[in-house]
Amino acid sequence: MDLFEYQAKELFAKHNVPSTPGRVTDTAEGAKAIATEIGRPVMVKAQVKIGGRGKAGGVKYAATPQDAYEHAKNILGLDIKGHIVKKLLVAEASDIAEEYYLSFLLDRANRTYLAMCSVEGGMEIEEVAATKPERLAKVPVNAVKGVDLDFARSIAEQGHLPAEVLDTAAVTIAKLWELFVAEDATLVEVNPLVRTPDHKILALDAKITLDGNADFRQPGHAEFEDRAATDPLELKAKEHDLNYVKLDGQVGIIGNGAGLAMSTLDVVAYAGEKHGGVKPANFLDIGGGASAEVMAAGLDVVLGDQQVKSVFVNVFGGITSCDAVATGIVKALGMLGDEANKPLVVRLDGNNVEEGRRILTEANHPLVTLVATMDEAADKAAELASA
């Protein structure tokens, strides 16, 4: 579960990670009241679970409470990459001497944890990794030993933080590790981690992802779930017991099985590079069954995304045979009627594949293109999305 910034900062306070005081509100009047209470210039920050807030006008400096009110009026209701701003964090503005970057995350490839630290904070970390890789330290963390002050200082030193802040930064880094472990997080990211003119270290921004598999031992995390702010397509998918995650691309993905769906994301992203940077629009696993009702629900969710230009249905027939899947696709298109208005690229393989292909061929639906291999299907879906 991804947290809003204000929720992440609640965990900062719980674990004594230094940050700036502030409160959340959903009205312009509330923003003015909080700014008045703080009594200093503030930052008015849109609360959305996506990057790029600043470039979209979702983060503003307010010198006075009236400025906070005016900014809040403009930010509330703002559409940031499909996310509508419904809440604001109003936090005390901080004097900044330098900006750094710090994160803890799972290193799945090496089956361990990873600390990342850089003196180049305040910008997209992907940009730092691409343009100044020598300025980004990637430090493996032993899960048993963890991060004590000495190791935290080493992380800061490898990230090229100035010598005069190493000890202070180490304290904050150790506290962030404590949070990471205690809260069963898969990501704790601070960008920027700043040094003030008086050499204090503050975590000004916060991005935290919590591991839903640990909910059974983290009952307090339930309060962080915000159904009103959850993507409506994700809510619709949840109602049908479908595993759906919205992304920012143009090719809708439907796969039966999480592994196949993940592989489909990869091949579409690769194929999309040849077609103007087309990307996957979602992850959707319809599970082992692909009945007409399940397929219709999946298509309904995927086609509800206005960014989707084509759909790639990638199914491997196992217990559910390919002929049953093909029948489900044909029936689903009939059930959806005019709502099924984007081209579908279908790739079938596995149990009874020839019969499945025959059913789709004879149906001769104008929206359906039947393709033999996954690579060809990904290329076709990306081509259609770029047209």
Swiss-Prot record:
Top EC category: ligase
GO biological process, alphabetically ordered: succinyl-CoA metabolic process; tricarboxylic acid cycle
Entry's Gene Ontology cellular component terms: cytosol; succinate-CoA ligase complex
EC numbers for this chain: 6.2.1.5
Reaction(s) catalysed (UniProt annotation): succinate + ATP + CoA = succinyl-CoA + ADP + phosphate; GTP + succinate + CoA = succinyl-CoA + GDP + phosphate
Residues holding ATP: 45, 52-54, 94, 99
Any one Gene Ontology molecular-function term assigned to this protein's record: succinate-CoA ligase (GDP-forming) activity
Coiled coil: none
Domain ATP-grasp: 9-236
PANTHER family per record: SUCCINATE--COA LIGASE [GDP-FORMING] SUBUNIT BETA, MITOCHONDRIAL, SUCCINYL-COA SYNTHETASE BETA CHAIN
Record's protein name: Succinate--CoA ligase [ADP-forming] subunit beta
Species of provenance: Mycobacterium bovis (strain ATCC BAA-935 / AF2122/97)
